[in-house]
């Protein structure tokens, strides 16, 4: 029988203690594998950093939602000074078009031979579970970045700016890089653009490629954390982000993330091949409701 995770996204919380499970026990209780995958993936997802649950129950394979626009900032008609016996004008905000986010279904399976089961080959089980976990993370993160790119592209350039070259920044020596050409100037510029939008967005998360994370560490060394604290931002690196680019966002404000089914694991035996199968899957649905709460930064590698 399928065994869904009782915990919310990303995939549930770690429960296994000291990895003391047998292959036979795991195959008989697939929930243990679900929890193991949750343990391995807990800190690796981009989606929970920028999306939050809408609180809606997901039915019918899709979720309807509205996406914020710049026209929401002010009413379509200006307010007026009222004279004696006059009425104030009727003011409204523009009505937003509805969008539809479809539920996605991602999963995979792997075999465990009867021999591995009898001999309690925990190494084989762990190797396959880890590989499946990494693949789930890669797929969900790839889809998350694709959703961000689609929303940013729809803004027609308003959601992108060219940053400084982080790979050549120097903070000391005889020829230090000017302050307005250092990586920290991109932190300041991102928030400046958000303030100019007047939509109340505070950028507090930078999602970067490991290359850019390494360049920051090289440039600032032990002072990096103090710099991030000063700008009140958190750094998260992922190989799903193209090298030389970054995404700056307000944590939890970009959109919604729900799921028709959380991470589920099931197992069954195929007698003809003397093999047991382990299958795990997750059915997420997400959408960008506020594209102005995220920006793409390019040119970070020159």
Model feature map: region roles:
Residues 93-156, 271-284, 288:
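Long, contiguous amphipathic alpha-helices that act as assembly "spine/axial" helices in icosahedral shell
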Residues 24-49, 188-190, 247, 252-263:
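Short, Φ-rich (hydrophobic/aromatic) sequence segments
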Residues 33-106:
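Assembly/oligomerization interface modules of large self-assembling protein complexes
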Residues 154-230:
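Extended, solvent-exposed, turn-rich assembly/linker loops in the middle of proteins
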Residues 27, 63-82, 114-130:
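Charged, low-complexity, helix/coiled-coil-prone segments
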Residues 108, 201-204, 231, 274-276:
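Structural beta-strand/beta-sheet cores of well-ordered domains, especially the beta-sheet scaffolds
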